[in-house]
């Protein structure tokens, strides 16, 4: 028998019957009102009841708790547009769409509007009670609808479900359909609740309490989370737990080809000094950081091959050319594997193209003839011939990768790398990577603390990019919460945006800056078009920003911008990390600049509040920064639109009352150095051998082949992947040493000057970090 904390028997339904949807909705209502650990406890009680009375329904309950219909890689998504939901609510309740919209403006939550509309509706007969499996199956059917009349069919199906809802059920049904539950319950909390439930459902002795019970729950939570990391499939996880026990999860739910895992990610770093501090007395390797898309390539024992994105989306149909050619890359005796790689766009000469180009590739049936040509850079092996390798050190994984896979010219290569702890060599290797259209370097431990940490951003991997060396340690991916109407040159489009980070604990978006810099006219036109379908009448309750920042138009969380900035500061108005700072104030960006749209990220994948706080604390100036000084700066006074200057395209950020030039203008306007042909590299004197490595420089066979074709392909593959066999050709001042690269011009000093009026250049959108690390 399951007992609540009050000691009384919890509300039950008949054993063996289906879980009532109302019981699930009431649980969500309670969770919405609770905070912290109490949310997990409440959900754990519900899961325990399900295990006791209707264990077959547990999988549907768990998926609905995380607002999913299946594993991410199956691609079943709800996310019904707000306008369609309004139509369905109006149809189900007999009210006009205008009245529904009016209530929505007042309430700010369509789920609440639907609940009240149904409660006020007179019914001739009480509808049959909904069950969790019934709702889950209906939602799955709705998600699978496609074709020209799919939206009308969805509205009809949703309307029918709403008619069957009673009371609180309508609120959470609509929220699920919208794709946002907004109860402050993240996936990690659901996994914890599941671990607690597996513990509580087995305990019949009420004397098992206190530390002993907590210890049992903690052990099972660890089992559940470990199993889910390697096998992110609730169907499989719950099946094993029910049939073989929670103790069998780690052994039975291992990494398996065909089930993508969330990749290991890197922490940003601003220079060599930080790298050497982090990796003191550790062997490490440096790899070029390619400007592409993360590609997780799986081969099963039956020969099927799949390619998944960093978000576990199935990209197999996007890269049929890779699937077709990969067999030639696989060595003899290889039966199954999971490879971590980077897919990069190249031109006909083999020159690396930016991620912006790759993002234009067709999502289905793309080839060299009708799409963007790509190559694959392999850098890690996670599973090989039936054995998971994630707990083995990188050196061993890399050895197996290079032994059992082959380079195929024009298609597959190993990531260009060098094993070294010498700062001069790292500097030179960084310069070479930047010269060859890469974003910078990935620095990784080889032997100690060198396992593959699934779904974690680890300090065992560091990324050093050209865009933030000696500046803020990383770019940010921020959600567009709202926009401000444009004037002057920007009349008819949006002139600027309100951006926010994501707080996964509260499931809220917290404002972090206003932005109006870095956009081309093409960018603004494209964004305006995209956002028209995302407009909502009122800022939702899960948007946190000061009333003085209210935008002209507000949007549902959809579009994600990659942004860089000069500085991160305490803010009296912005809400980012406001509950995490010492004084409770928020954090904001100074001189933010748009880089590109992150098509590969959902709104919940945006930079988190904790990451923003960490970036603030990691600034070099943090130790000397006084809050009083930070408070004196109103970062939004720097948001100014140049509406009367025909020659100016971009907005200029100016501090109120300041006549000084933008202090970040040099740093943010440097362009990527132009690619240099292999012959130009050879004219420069080679870098002197370091004390660590005095072996002669060897010429890469790939480079020789490329030179015969008289193309710059050698620029991509010029360095050896073996220790002490580097092919570093460029001797140029490193940006790490605060000097410009030879290709930097003084134009960047003029381009953002606030005292001079210079014609704005028509530039292509800067394409940088795909954050595919």
UniProtKB/Swiss-Prot annotation:
Residues 626-773 are annotated as: Disordered. GO terms for cellular component: nucleus. Residues 658-685 have a biased composition (Basic and acidic residues). It is found in: Nucleus. Residues 180-189, 362-364 are annotated as: Interaction with target DNA. It catalyses: ATP + (deoxyribonucleotide)n-3'-hydroxyl + 5'-phospho-(deoxyribonucleotide)m = (deoxyribonucleotide)n+m + AMP + diphosphate. Its EC number is 6.5.1.1. The record marks 37, 311, 489, 514 as: Interaction with target DNA. One of its GO terms (molecular function) is metal ion binding. The active site is at 289 (n6-amp-lysine intermediate). Residues 633-649 have a biased composition (Acidic residues). Mg(2+) 2 binds at residue 439. PROSITE patterns: DNA_LIGASE_A1 (PS00697), DNA_LIGASE_A2 (PS00333), DNA_LIGASE_A3 (PS50160). Its cofactor is Mg(2+). InterPro entries: ATP-dep_DNA_ligase (IPR050191), DNA_ligase_ATP-dep (IPR000977), DNA_ligase_ATP-dep_C (IPR012309), DNA_ligase_ATP-dep_cent (IPR012310), DNA_ligase_ATP-dep_CS (IPR016059), DNA_ligase_ATP-dep_N (IPR012308), DNA_ligase_N_sf (IPR036599), NA-bd_OB-fold (IPR012340). One of its GO terms (biological process) is Okazaki fragment processing involved in mitotic DNA replication. Residues 687-700 have a biased composition (Low complexity). Mg(2+) 1 binds at residue 342. Pfam families: DNA_ligase_A_C, DNA_ligase_A_M, DNA_ligase_A_N. ATP binds at residues 287, 294, 342, 444, 463. It is an enzyme of class 6 (ligase). Keywords: ATP-binding, Cell cycle, Cell division, DNA damage, DNA recombination, DNA repair, DNA replication, Ligase, Magnesium, Metal-binding, Nucleotide-binding, Nucleus. DNA ligase that seals nicks in double-stranded DNA during DNA replication, DNA recombination and DNA repair. Belongs to the ATP-dependent DNA ligase family. This is DNA ligase 1. The lineage of its organism: Eukaryota, Metazoa, Ecdysozoa, Nematoda, Chromadorea.
